[in-house]
A protein has these predicted regions:
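Anion-binding and metal-coordination hotspots
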Residues: 1-241
Length: 241
């Protein structure tokens, strides 16, 4: 930037298998979520194969990405952003978190901690930047006026409003069930020693901390020259053990 600040312009995505880089992509997207599907498709296309498993960290967990994995029969070992928080005992003790409230699916109604009904009001659909549609059911309590716990429950002048995405809740439940397996827990732990090592080695040992070329294509070429070297170093390390 002209003011001397350095800000990230490209998001590098790396796919690994047994500590070897098997594919990479360069994206202008600042967040990882929307790079997941195109990166996965690109790597599979280049290798001419279809993956049975896809392992990624919580930055990639989204409704759209989970749908893609399920539709393509890929077992996704992917946490979502609030996974760690939701799987702690303290989360269940959060009285005013609507996910801990009683919900009557038949009546389409929540019951708040004070026993007041929070009925269904309407359904809204939102489109994200990639064009994916998310559907929410809106619930609103009409008895918040005078409630002694209102300040703890909501800051809205209209009372407590809940946006329920039933599909997302189902997906999160599946992720929790999947990651309760020791087999998948082990695979998830392995991920951190694979992809993170690529960036750690590149920055720490090779001293590569910024690109010298400009433009997505040239940045891809520069990163592409680094990755075979990384894999070659891995091969030498294995041969010497």
């Amino acid at each position: 930037m002209l003011n001397g600040q350095l800000k990230p312009d490209y998001n590098i995505q790396v796919g690994t298998e047994n500590n070897f880089v098997i594919g990479y992509d360069v994206f202008p997207n600042p967040t990882d979520t929307r790079t997941f599907i195109p990166h996965l498709e690109n790597v599979q296309k280049r290798l001419g194969c279809k993956f049975k498993f896809a392992i990624a960290d919580a930055g990639y967990g989204s409704e759209e990405n989970y749908d893609y994995l399920e539709e393509n029969e890929i077992t996704g070992i992917v946490k979502y952003t609030t996974y760690e928080k939701e799987t702690k005992r303290t989360f269940k003790k959060k009285t005013f978190n609507s996910e801990n409230w009683k919900y009557d699916a038949e009546q389409k109604e929540y019951t708040c901690p004070c026993g007041n009904p929070v009925p269904y009001r309407k359904t809204v659909t939102k489109k994200n930047k990639s064009g994916y549609l998310q559907t929410y059911e809106v619930y609103q309590c009409e008895n918040c006026e005078g409630c002694p716990f209102r300040e703890l429950c909501t800051k809205s002048e209209y009372g407590r409003v809940i946006q329920r995405n039933g599909h997302w809740l189902e997906q999160k439940a599946k992720v929790k069930e999947l990651l309760s397996s020791e087999e998948y827990k082990t695979l998830m732990k392995k991920r951190s020693t694979e992809c993170e090592t690529v960036f750690g080695q590149t920055k720490g040992n090779l001293g590569f901390r910024r690109f010298h070329l400009r433009g997505k294509e040239k940045v891809g070429i520069e990163w592409g020259l680094l990755m075979p070297g990384y894999d070659f170093r891995q091969l030498i390390r294995l041969m010497n053990t």
